[in-house]
């Protein structure tokens, strides 16, 4: 397994997996652009683990640390910063939208899947949808 770690203000760690595929009955959904809608404030410290998988590519796992008391706008900024730190800026663009939303778009290359693998942050709800 090959690992690459990136830390941004002590909040973000990214891990690139050298292998891994989805099960046949658990096929990911691909798009060129995704929206992550953040609702509610954090009621605990914790982490959010996202997986970005280019079609027929290597999955990239992005772990974002969230501090207790962070509001939805700041959580969106933490997620945006996590994507920026972990993903190649020549391939992906990320930004916040409406304060509490994060957009992740491809600049070039194949469409990609985006999923929240797990979250240990209490109270925060995320809605991930294709744009």
Locate each region found by the language model:
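Bacterial N-terminal signal peptides that target proteins for export
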Residues: 1-10
């Amino acid at each position: 397994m090959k690992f690459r770690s990136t830390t941004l203000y002590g909040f973000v760690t990214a891990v690139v997996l050298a292998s891994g595929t989805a099960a046949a009955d658990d096929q990911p959904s691909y798009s060129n652009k995704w929206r992550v809608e953040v609702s509610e404030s954090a009621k605990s410290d914790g982490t959010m683990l996202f997986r970005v998988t280019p079609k027929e590519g290597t999955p990239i796992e992005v772990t974002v640390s969230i501090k207790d008391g962070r509001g939805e706008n700041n959580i969106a900024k933490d997620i945006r910063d996590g994507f920026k730190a972990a993903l190649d800026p020549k391939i992906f663009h990320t930004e916040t939208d409406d304060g509490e939303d994060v957009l992740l778009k491809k600049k070039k290359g194949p469409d990609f899947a985006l999923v929240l693998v797990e979250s240990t942050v209490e109270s925060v709800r995320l809605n991930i949808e294709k744009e």
